[in-house]
Amino acid sequence: MKKRFPTLLATLIWTALYSQHTLADLAEQCMLGVPTYDQPLVTGDPNQLPVRINADKTEANYPDNALFTGNVIVQQGNSTLTANQVELTQVQKPGEAIPVRTVTATGDVNYDDPQIKLKGPKGWSNLNTKDTDMDKGKYQMVGRQGRGDADLMKLRGQNRYTILENGTFTSCLPGDNSWSVVGSEVIHDREEQVAEIWNARFKIGKVPVFYSPYMQLPVGDKRRSGFLIPNAKYTSNNGLEFMLPYYWNIAPNFDATITPHYMERRGLQWQNEFRYLLAPGSGTMALDWLPSDRLYHGTDGTEKDPTRWLYYWGHSGVMDKVWRFNVNYTRVSDPDYFTDLTSQYGSTTDGYATQIFSVGYADQNWDATLASKQFQVFTTGGNNNAYRAQPQLDMNYYKNDIGPFDLHIYGQAAKFTSVNPENPEAERFHIEPSINLPLANGWGSLNTEAKLLATHYQQDIPNGFASNYKNQNGQDATVPNLKDSVNRVIPQFKVDGKVVFDRPMDWSEGFTQTLEPRVQYLYVPYRNQDDIYIYDTTLMQSDYSGLFRDRTYSGLDRIASANQVSTGLTSRIYDDELVERFNVSVGQIYYFSRSRTGNSETIDNSDDTGSLVWAGDTFWRINDQLGLKGGAQYDTRLGSLTLGNAVMEYRKDAERMIQLNYRYASPEYIQAAVPNVKSPGYQQGISQIGTTASWPIADRWALVGAYYYDTKANQPASQLVGVQYNTCCWAINLGYERKITGWNNQNETSKYDNKVSFNIELRGLSSDHSLGTAQMLGSGILPYQSAF
């Protein structure tokens, strides 16, 4: 395994050099085979425009008809008809001021306008309405991909509709018949950008592979009901997969996509997505339903319910400028769902699914939010310790300019329940008034704040709590000495000052450098909180910005004492267009006394004082393509470097990118952050080095790769390689992914999942001519994220 990393890196370096000479822009290549209309556009009523005819020979019976032979060219406005012979007929109907003029053309007939080109042996056209017929002809769209042939072609509705009888349609360029759709009748609506096909037969080459009595295909980017581009692929887990999305444009503010997703080894899954736009906001609802998964046996190998599903609802909106509605709800049938099945609404790396509903009201100086919060945890046993806040009410009141002071009052009421009946439950009431004195000018600020944190807990402690706690945390674990009723009152005082200095840089004209020192003093007296259970609290990261937070923990269950000074220094460099090119920040927390919440937390066991916590962040955008960033946090209370990351990325454009990164989390930090979750797979810490890259390797070929190696476990964490070949009307993708999906308790090793995928995509029906690298990189367990 260790030899694969340099081999992949060498390959990427070679392709980076080679592709500079071989890559041509795919969009430009595709448009080379598409006809364009390069004549000046004529405006005005087509019926009022004159008809110009040139021919080698003319015979006329004025005013009824005329016969033109030899190199005939008929022009009216933006329409041109050429043929060997053309007969012009003019009929004056009673009561109509404009006569009906028609032409019948024979012999090498060609018709073109700004939207379409037609070619055939015989044609007819009404010069008044632009209705045109062509026998046994061929057509090609102007300015976009799309062509075909038919026994009879018709143009109707001022060239809006192209109607084909026994016709074909393909987005492939002339000379390439890789795929096509054949129908007894095909209607192409240029305004709605859709093709309707009756008795549709989908062909690959000359071989029919799919039949439908009726089909709609989009031929543009406009919203329109109809079948979207089908997709087929092969994976080692699911076998052959085929997806045929149907888009339903229900109304201007409603639409839906229904996708039957056939998986050879699992069965038929229905993927349904509904989008809406209403006065309270916009949102998306999704339901994925696999009624009988033939492969699912669960993580322990036992039989599980084969019905697998996912429900998602995302909503965000504001109504009447004061009401706010938000929903972020995801629920799946089982904890293995994202491991086995691909979804845009979650992944195995998330670890949990969020289920939050909230409605808020905001006025000029106060706001209130009522929410329901719940989490579906996927780790083994993790869901037994998960808590839900149902309901949770948060309120804020602001009153500024009370003399030189600003007043803020925050309040919360929450009820916590657990899915495990042996866990404590609680009602929590919290009020937090604060008053601050803000002072600021153009180069600095000083903010002095005093607040009072008052919290009441009413806890319901079950009789079996002690034994349940020991079963989960070990028989030698110390059971928290919880109380039914707890009152906690803690004052807080803080002074925060910062200054910004700037100067022109001597060595680079137009560049500006800033120096931004910051000092904060924080005092919070100690209160023992071991009699309060943990409901929504976890240890937060101490990155540079975190050095100046009031709290060490999220939530309200733990408020750490503090008698400390945080100091930091930031320097930034801006170019002549005020784009930030470089910054570096370094800071520390100096503790005058021990910071603690009681005796139960790991981080409370340290008696050290002084400079205990250090953090630094840096960012360097060397140029528009190359950048570096990183950060590190050191906490002597946990005995080591706790968190670290570093990223270097070169991005030339959307298709060419190389990223190197490293991420680290100490086992002590993980234990302190998630003490109730026991998983040997990551309790030893995280130390991963990896690379992610995408690069065109030759004309129309793109390669992506990702490799992450865990230096703690001495094993690969994730491997991904994919290659895609793109043409103007189809693309083919071959990929391999190997990822960790769990932990085997029997032999104490990581469980891996290996997946080989083979994917075919139809192209040319929209304006997307990308090489597909973004989709391939986003499919991995550790999806690519841009560094800058």
Swiss-Prot record:
Transmembrane segments: none annotated. GO terms for biological process: Gram-negative-bacterium-type cell outer membrane assembly; lipopolysaccharide transport. One of its GO terms (cellular component) is cell outer membrane. It is found in: Cell outer membrane. InterPro entries: LipoPS_assembly_LptD, LptD, LptD_C, OstA-like_N. Together with LptE, is involved in the assembly of lipopolysaccharide (LPS) at the surface of the outer membrane. PANTHER family: LPS-ASSEMBLY PROTEIN (PTHR30189), LPS-ASSEMBLY PROTEIN LPTD (PTHR30189:SF1). Belongs to the LptD family. This is LPS-assembly protein LptD. It comes from Yersinia enterocolitica serotype O:8 / biotype 1B (strain NCTC 13174 / 8081).
